[in-house]
Amino acid sequence: MGQELSQHERYVEQLKQALKTRGVKVKYADLLKFFDFVKDTCPWFPQEGTIDIKRWRRVGDCFQDYYNTFGPEKVPVTAFSYWNLIKELIDKKEVNPQVMAAVAQTEEILKSNSQTDLTKTSQNPDLDLISLDSDDEGAKSSSLQDKGLSSTKKPKRFPVLLTAQTSKDPEDPNPSEVDWDGLEDEAAKYHNPDWPPFLTRPPPYNKATPSAPTVMAVVNPKEELKEKIAQLEEQIKLEELHQALISKLQKLKTGNETVTHPDTAGGLSRTPHWPGQHIPKGKCCASREKEEQIPKDIFPVTETVDGQGQAWRHHNGFDFAVIKELKTAASQYGATAPYTLAIVESVADNWLTPTDWNTLVRAVLSGGDHLLWKSEFFENCRDTAKRNQQAGNGWDFDMLTGSGNYSSTDAQMQYDPGLFAQIQAAATKAWRKLPVKGDPGASLTGVKQGPDEPFADFVHRLITTAGRIFGSAEAGVDYVKQLAYENANPACQAAIRPYRKKTDLTGYIRLCSDIGPSYQQGLAMAAAFSGQTVKDFLNNKNKEKGGCCFKCGKKGHFAKNCHEHAHNNAEPKVPGLCPRCKRGKHWANECKSKTDNQGNPIPPHQGNRVEGPAPGPETSLWGSQLCSSQQKQPISKLTRATPGSAGLDLCSTSHTVLTPEMGPQALSTGIYGPLPPNTFGLILGRSSITMKGLQVYPGVIDNDYTGEIKIMAKAVNNIVTVSQGNRIAQLILLPLIETDNKVQQPYRGQGSFGSSDIYWVQPITCQKPSLTLWLDDKMFTGLIDTGADVTIIKLEDWPPNWPITDTLTNLRGIGQSNNPKQSSKYLTWRDKENNSGLIKPFVIPNLPVNLWGRDLLSQMKIMMCSPNDIVTAQMLAQGYSPGKGLGKKENGILHPIPNQGQSNKKGFGNF
């Protein structure tokens, strides 16, 4: 016994030195107590004679079972810490010679002890697990019987085996055929509450007269160990082959697919657990099948258990959907926003290695934030490593950061769950210390309501964005309410404005519930025809027309027309120079002159003659005189914007709304020729008008032109409103150079816009002029009927699922239709050139053909002219092909345009 203790003490001393080389100091007495505890809880361990990671993990499982059964007061405080330290030594025994020597000597001691335990069962009955009598003990059987084995000897650890030894059953099993692992599991069932209860009780003890135990042959320990070693080597080969196939299959997979282990192959998935949570490896397969199965592609590190109960860990890639969502949240709301932190915490709940954390942060954050996170993470790991060193668990800085000997992913995969928890705490703590960049509310102020977006959907987007920034929508409810009004479209703002301070966000939604696309369309048309923007139209809609007099406070007149205090004026105003004739000092409404001081005729007075002082020279809002007047004004009445302006300002005399579908339109200016002598005019558009979407076409005004100067303008993209008096063009006067060229016409006169030479020709043939259009993507063919006011569709061609309603209108033509039906909604028409518009046709039964009326033809801008024979001959001479028209893609212009123009031309054209 002394020799056994000396070997045991020598092994403990070498183990102490091996731990000291790794920087861990332990007490010799504590190690002795620890191995005594190992013998008590794991009596099978000395008999194995081998120390490897698999058996040492079984020792850890026994510790956990013992802890769960008898409580923490029966377990030494340092038991689990020493178990972790020795586990690390076993993992690193190949790289440390001293550790290899300590492990080898321990195995030798265990093998020798296992032989002595088999032969010395009577000397140490407390440590005897199973009594095996050898041939040498045959002579002692009678003495054993005399001692009264059943009454004097202490009971064995396994009563079932003791009963089997003392029974007189002639069919006792051969000790060499005993399943030692099965007996171990059976013994564990007596104190493991996780195992299912026994259905039958063990056989009772035989209380008859003790008899001599059956003499059995002693099992050769070497042969048994060789047999177990061969089995283990075969199992290792199979496991290596199994892992190689799994690795090869994972490489063949693409995307997030991972290898699944079906139950038929013996592979059961085990999900990661929280630190401190432990599942004994001796549980039956039925209990494992009840565990929640989680897809493996969610966790970078997963663990599977094969049919033999062996646990294997695998490393999978991140789910790219999670990375994309985290990247979007960090970029849009900030790295420390509540929504971003919630995603980080959900990812951190899994087993992430230090390499996984570094990869995730580098992919999601910017370069500077990644360096900040890394510095904070390393600092947190240093603090954690110091606490681990004080606790003596051996989890150092290299393990926490994945550096040094733990830089590979394979080494990091073998970390304990507790170490994964420490890495998670350090990483998330570093993430929370990232600085806040920019304005967190910038993304919230950028949420604006679209023109056709329902107000409820807009508020939902606001609340969702606010919840991701502030953590909850209630935290920023006042801010959201303010933005719900300021970022709403003009229609919703007008509906909310009277009740803005009287209701909450729910009231806003109720007020704007009826505002839809149709309301927006009608509002835009009303604002366009009133010459205002939608916002100005809504602001001025509820204002009372007419103001109050600033003198008397009464409504109905202004201060300049107030007669309330007219008698208080001590000195009457003296009229100045007459703005009409510029010849004398009198009021303009009292002027009787027919011509001005330059001899130009003065137009007569218009409108009511109101007594009072003269209003002075008539000017427009922009400074141009007489731009809004309906009178005929000469060129001399035009003004320049500044002394350095090159052109004279031209204004519109009426309020006009232009749309892109209308094409070029001639706008009146009220200015008439002729131009000053020896000059001609060039009309150009203003830059500010071009920026607003109104295109002004250039034009030339001849010196002898006496008609009205008009402006050719077109709306480019959107609806453009030209208010009365707005400066939209300028007239530039240039010197006229006279040459000896032949003159076709002695005097231009008032011939102005309009063409008498170019026509859209519809040949009149025996065939009816038909046209094919698409109404809501359904094709219809009808006649072009310029005599029909409205478009009419046959009831037989009308789709039955399109709604129609009765009308109170009577259609008259060749026949008569009383109360015809009409489409309940506007239909979108489209031609072959993708021109489109809206139409609401009538539907009449028994109509022979569909009729395209003027309501549709006017939108298509169709012009039908009737040229005379002379014009037709001229067009044919220029290469016109009947039914095809002019152009190089049709028949082409065969000859250049001649220089001889028409002598009595009016407007455009050269034929």
Curated annotation (Swiss-Prot):
Phenotype upon changing Y880A: 90% loss of infectivity and 65% loss of RT activity
Biased composition (Polar residues): 113-125, 140-152
Effect of L886A: 85% loss of infectivity and 60% loss of RT activity
Pfam families: dUTPase (PF00692), G-patch (PF01585), Gag_p10 (PF02337), Gag_p24 (PF00607), Gag_p24_C (PF19317), RVP (PF00077), zf-CCHC_5 (PF14787)
Site residues, Cleavage: M100, A101, L161, L162, M216, A217, F299, P300, M525, A526, Y759, W760, A873, Q874
Chain span(s) of sequence motif PPXY motif: 202-205
Signal peptide region: none
Assigned keywords, A-Z: Aspartyl protease, Capsid protein, Coiled coil, DNA-binding, Hydrolase, Lipoprotein, Magnesium, Metal-binding, Myristate, Nucleotide metabolism, Protease, Repeat, Viral matrix protein, Viral nucleoprotein, Virion, Zinc, Zinc-finger
Propiece span(s): 101-161
Gene name as annotated: gag-pro
GO cellular component terms, semicolon-separated: viral nucleocapsid
Annotated effect of mutating G885A: 70% loss of infectivity and 60% loss of RT activity
Effect of N868I: Accelerated processing of the protease C-terminus
Residue ranges occupied by any Peptidase A2 domain in the UniProt entry: 780-856
Zn finger spans (CCHC-type): 547-564, 576-593
Catalytic activity: dUTP + H2O = dUMP + diphosphate + H(+)
One Gene Ontology biological process: nucleotide metabolic process
Segments forming domain G-patch: 867-911
Name the UniProt record assigns to this protein: Gag-Pro polyprotein
Entry EC no(s): 3.6.1.23, 3.4.23.-
Motif (PTAP/PSAP motif): 210-213
